[in-house]
Amino acid sequence: PDISVTPDSFDEILFVDEVLNREIIIQNDGVADLNWNLNLFNYGRDGTSYTFTNCDKEGNEGPSQEECDSEYQGTMLEGFVTVDGGIQQWIVPASGTYTIDVHGAKGGDSNWSGNAYVGGLGAKMQGQFALEAGQILNILVGQVGTSSSEGGGGGGTYVAKADETPLIVAGGGGGAGGTGDGIGGVTETSGTDGAAGGAGGVDGNGGSVGSGNAGAGSGFYTDGAANYGGSKSYLNGGTGSSPGNWAAGGFGGGGHGWGSGGNGGGAGGYSGGGTSGASYIGGGGGGSFNSGLDQINIASVNADHGVVTITLDSPPISWATLSDNAGVTGVGEVDTVTLALDASDLEMGEYSAGISLISNDPDDPDIDIPISMTVIYDVEIVDIDDASIEE
């Protein structure tokens, strides 16, 4: 899919009690269906947002305290993240409703005998959660699987409570094999089977192996299966599988790739992806999990390392509504969504909001459309007859 959206912003002036409708045009110029979601958000109290990254770490092991200290220097996270075995611990600063957005990591690419294939993309999961000041969250940010003659599985991205209860998990993408692409992370809890290969894990468990010696992805609770090495579950530290010189799985439970142009590794996730079979195609994508409200879940969307964004939510918006919040736009087609601005219950002043458009376009998956509205009084001009004015 290839998304095109107009307009890119709204700047409107309304009289008190006026209602105004404007159109948002969503066009798909790509060669596959475009899946999209629209969400209104209020700029009034937004801005309190915390973004957790892989701290520039790559490979099967997570970042160190020093690497994350350097990454977050000068940000709102400086001095507030403690790293233990690559897992980042953060204390919630204020009670409230938070939106947590997580992305699984991409699988590694393959290049064998002049044939190049790409790893599967990571899933995106988003939900709202009530958090308390002082509450500890454990955050594991998945890392991209290693690219070689075969690809390692991408790591899943996890957010859990201090007692290790999962809140939200985004599955990584499977590693590419010598003859085919890796399979993307999915929004369902079960990991996917590797292409003609091992079964994906279920109920938070690791995936299985098929023919060959690649490693399956791990789940939240149990490790991924492997003949050599093996990826570790979230509860066991989340290390990606890395036996010998084979392509390592990414941190977050990614399984290793195998051989020279062999099978791709399974991805980590809530449940792990399986490995590919004897056809040496791609590894399976990781499963995902979301216990939040107002969910936005999209499979196969992230082409990079994982990321976690936690945002203190703003109050609901009463003066703006959308005619549709989700849809599928076919190839070469256009969809129209109506934005209604309603100043009926507003006082004179300036109001700001935004529209977040999230899609499966890999090059432009998240678009913000700002809304600026000024409300003024409607002044009525009355003609006065000069003859009626007494001196």
What are these regions (language model features)?
Residues P1-G47, D313-D385, I389-E390:
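Feature for long, exposed domains in two main contexts
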Residues D29-A32, Y43-G44, G104-G108, A133, ...:
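Acidic glycine-/aspartate-rich tracts in secreted/extracellular proteins
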Residues R45-G108, L167, G175:
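GGW-centered surface loops in extracellular recognition modules
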Residues G74, G79-T82, I87-Y98, G127-Q135, ...:
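Extracellular and analogous surface-interaction loops
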Residues Y98-G104, I136-Q143, V169-G171, S271, ...:
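Extracellular beta-strand-rich recognition modules
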Residues G119-G224:
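Secretome/extracellular-domain signature
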Residues A195-G262, G266:
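Acidic, glycine-rich loop-and-strand cores that form catalytic or ligand-binding grooves
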